[in-house]
Swiss-Prot record:
SUPFAM superfamilies: Photosystem II reaction center protein I, PsbI (SSF161041). Coiled coil: none annotated. Its main location: membrane. The chain crosses the membrane at residues 3-25. Belongs to the PsbI family. Disruption phenotype: Loss of about 25% of PSII activity, cells are slightly more photosensitive. Altered assembly of PSII, with destabilized binding of CP43 (psbC). It comes from Synechocystis sp. (strain ATCC 27184 / PCC 6803 / Kazusa). It is a single-pass membrane protein. Keywords: Formylation, Membrane, Photosynthesis, Photosystem II, Reaction center, Thylakoid, Transmembrane, Transmembrane helix. GO terms for cellular component: photosystem II reaction center; plasma membrane-derived thylakoid membrane; plasma membrane-derived thylakoid photosystem II. GO terms for biological process: photosynthesis. This is Photosystem II reaction center protein I.
Length: 38
């Protein structure tokens, strides 16, 4: 049961990090004026 909980936490963390990374990487394409971050 503990292993299942750890696996669930890992999957949720991966999804959250992927969502945040995708949002940050697609942000400069939506705002062309903020190219200084690249």
């Amino acid at each position: 049961m503990l292993t299942l909980k750890i696996a669930v936490y890992i999957v949720v963390g991966l999804f959250i990090s992927l969502f945040i990374f995708g949002f940050l990487s697609s942000d400069p394409t939506r705002n062309p004026g903020r190219k200084d971050f690249e």
